[in-house]
């Protein structure tokens, strides 16, 4: 506001507002020139007058000062500013006041809502804690009542309990004595009936008593009879175990009974594992046979079901029976079982990985994830029983490896889909156009490529999201809750594909020799717009979608969205710059050939514009249409009203003196060169390969600069006759008539074409230009 208030009365008013009218134009121009010089040297009005600039801290008209006086300020405005400026100042102040008022209201409302939310939260917490305290009080009361009842019941039953216990002891002793006297007959009957377990239990119940009272004759006779019967029982059990025709539960029962009869545990342990190995190896052989080439392999879900029900189920039975039977073996027995499980488990895992490898080429993960879920779920039980064998960890590692391979597979699929989309675009661009039927436009091709890529990305995300579904048994593992989401899906798949897409797009900026073929300029333009769209919206959308679907619980660093957007923008800039160079070189090649293949010394008097200049205008117009399909117009400088009527008088200003002077001396060209060079010193430097902005005007400006600079350099290398110079004059005027409307600043076209004509004049021994009116007639006719 202070800047607006300090504006002097001369600013903001045009020539029509000055009371002096046209007489004030000259002083006005001088004031503007002085102002530009002061702006260039960084001087203010105070510094020009000889004293340092800066607002007076005691100035009552300084809006931002501590001593601001509104009455003095308004009085100064009324005295120094016209009505129009007063109204503009009022409008600006009202706008700023409203903006400040709106900001203050927004700030108050935001903080008010936060305070209300915090108050509600605290009130809710108080209510919850009050309810908890009431419930705890009721619980303490109930516990006290229960304790009181328990004490009263125990005191009432104490006397009766002692009498009942004494009678029960006498009764139990009588039953034991009766059992001992009947033991030999019971054992004999159990062996005859095949009730080996019952016989062993009878023997176990009586063994300690018989050992304790074997010095008594009656007990000694019972013990001798029992030992004979027990020896016969052990022989039958060993025969049954060694036959191996029964199942795992029956064999485990035999070992259990033999151990109960006192047989050596070490020998039984080795025999038990040997029999179990044979059965489990049969299961592995059947699984390996399913992987053979001759029969069609079952689907992966059926394969894992068979392995889980057969091998894993059998291993669980063996492990459970072994731990129950040989627990007394201690660490040595556990190590034997762990080594046994590791060996056979490793062979089973190898078969599973071979079968899973056959699924890596498929695009659907649903069946594969279900198979991995069942595989991992079935190995929970042996993993718990055989923690030392590490079966559960090995199964998890297999699942993680498969998940990584699927991510890599989907990344390659996305890359292939992107390349396929580019191939379709190239074919569409190269396809011949039928009469009366136009092919798809660049905008349609861009929309097709963008939608196709986005569709493939969403499909891949949905496919790999199955690995983190809640119903999947391994989804709660640390890898799938953290690294899989952040480093696998986000960084490896999505960020990796976006960077690969940018690298693939940048590879089209290589020279044709490196790529094996020229890239269509339209493809460069389309890719630049695609990368720019990714920078502005698509990357943020894709990463937000990924973060929402895969709730990352990993603290490892990830690529920021801003970094990816910067890479995509840089790729778009390189592609667009390369597009400008390619199109500029195409037009430059036409201009270069047209200059180098013509004999400019013996050319005839120009009657028409050369065809190559018409072709340049046509190609530039086509490029303008092509770029306009994908990029916005851009900002142009204000165009002069006579841009199409200019007839190149700049080159003649420094040469007409030498051309029409009565005495043409050898010093004249030197003077002409000197004047031309002095004029170049004060003209703006033209950067041919300046950075290209993302708009149509900037692209066309870059192409035209390259083309006209090439024309200028070619003209400097040729020698022209009088008519050759006039032909260059006609051609340049024709180009000026049409090219100025494509560039951001028409002065750029004028300067370059002026230099072309001036260079041709310098290379001409007899520089006689054509009359501007004749040039205009020829160009209008052409």
From Swiss-Prot:
The modification Phosphoserine is found at residues 18, 44, 649. It is found in: Golgi apparatus, trans-Golgi network; Recycling endosome. GO terms for cellular component: cytosol; EARP complex; GARP complex; Golgi apparatus; membrane; nucleolus; recycling endosome; trans-Golgi network. Residues 1-31 are annotated as: Disordered. PANTHER family: VACUOLAR PROTEIN SORTING-ASSOCIATED PROTEIN 51 HOMOLOG. Component of the Golgi-associated retrograde protein (GARP) complex, also called VFT (VPS fifty-three) complex, composed of VPS51, VPS52, VPS53 and VPS54. Component of the endosome-associated retrograde protein (EARP) complex, composed of VPS51, VPS52, VPS53 and VPS50/Syndetin. EIPR1 interacts with both EARP and GARP complexes and mediates the recruitment of the GARP complex to the trans-Golgi network. Interacts with STX6 (via N-terminus). Interacts with VPS50 and VPS54 in an EIPR1-independent manner. Belongs to the VPS51 family. Acts as a component of the GARP complex that is involved in retrograde transport from early and late endosomes to the trans-Golgi network (TGN). The GARP complex is required for the maintenance of protein retrieval from endosomes to the TGN, acid hydrolase sorting, lysosome function, endosomal cholesterol traffic and autophagy. VPS51 participates in retrograde transport of acid hydrolase receptors, likely by promoting tethering and SNARE-dependent fusion of endosome-derived carriers to the TGN. Acts as a component of the EARP complex that is involved in endocytic recycling. This is Vacuolar protein sorting-associated protein 51 homolog.
